[in-house]
Amino acid sequence: MELQREQQGDKTVLTLPDDVTIYTVAELKEALSPLLHQGQVLELNLANVTEIDSAGLQLLLAAKKTALANGYPLHLVWHSYAVLELLELCQLSGFFGDPTLLPHAEHP
């Protein structure tokens, strides 16, 4: 799976697709894994995510834990409504430690 990747100084920004579910997480993990070991800050842009399930959430949790274990920060940015809703439902907003601001145009 080809993901939009942008280098911004000392960090890499990876934009996730609209579907982060059991049907796509294996491919997403394969694309994300090398970036977790590159030794620099990684941001996951979640603005495009319209569908996320427990498998997608597990991917985000595993990515965060791997980044922390490797000593490099991983930040979730531009949370979509679908992502915010799942994080709140599972009471995991605090785990990631990133501000969770909803873009103005995305309220239900």
Predicted features and spans:
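STAS-like cytosolic regulatory interaction modules
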Residues: 1-52, 62-108
